[in-house]
């Protein structure tokens, strides 16, 4: 893990095609902009976790229903 201090207007480069800019800092909140190729998925961690949980719920299968479908 890398920990870096940045000020408003400064940026961080990841590889040669991702740039994270510090847009604003206010009351303990940091606003950033991210420039990356379209094929790079960028999600807030809490949103990623929510999607992950929904996907887990979606794959839970009632085995009795599967057995009924298999009998047909």
Curated annotation (Swiss-Prot):
InterPro entries cross-referenced by the UniProt entry: CsrA, CsrA_sf
The keyword DNA-binding is annotated on this UniProt entry: no
Gene Ontology BP annotations: bacterial-type flagellum organization; mRNA catabolic process; negative regulation of translational initiation; regulation of bacterial-type flagellum assembly; regulation of carbohydrate metabolic process
Subcellular location: Cytoplasm
Entry GO terms, CC: cytosol
Coiled-coil spans in chain: none
Molecular functions (GO terms): mRNA 5'-UTR binding
Protein keywords: Bacterial flagellum biogenesis, Cytoplasm, Repressor, RNA-binding, Translation regulation
Domain of life assignment: Bacteria
Its biological purpose: A translational regulator that binds mRNA to regulate translation initiation and/or mRNA stability. Usually binds in the 5'-UTR at or near the Shine-Dalgarno sequence preventing ribosome-binding, thus repressing translation. Its main target seems to be the major flagellin gene, while its function is anatagonized by FliW.
Description of how the protein assembles with itself and partners: Homodimer; the beta-strands of each monomer intercalate to form a hydrophobic core, while the alpha-helices form wings that extend away from the core.
Family membership noted in the UniProt record: Belongs to the CsrA/RsmA family.
Annotated protein name in UniProt: Translational regulator CsrA
Organism of derivation: Clostridium novyi (strain NT)
Gene symbol of the encoding locus: csrA
């Amino acid at each position: 893990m890398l920990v870096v201090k940045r000020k408003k207007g400064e940026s961080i480069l990841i590889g040669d095609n991702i740039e994270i800019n510090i847009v604003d800092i206010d009351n303990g909140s940091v606003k950033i902009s991210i420039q990356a190729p379209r094929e790079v998925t960028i999600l807030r961690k809490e949103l990623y976790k929510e999607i992950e949980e929904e996907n887990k719920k979606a794959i839970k299968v009632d085995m009795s229903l599967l057995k009924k479908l298999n009998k047909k």
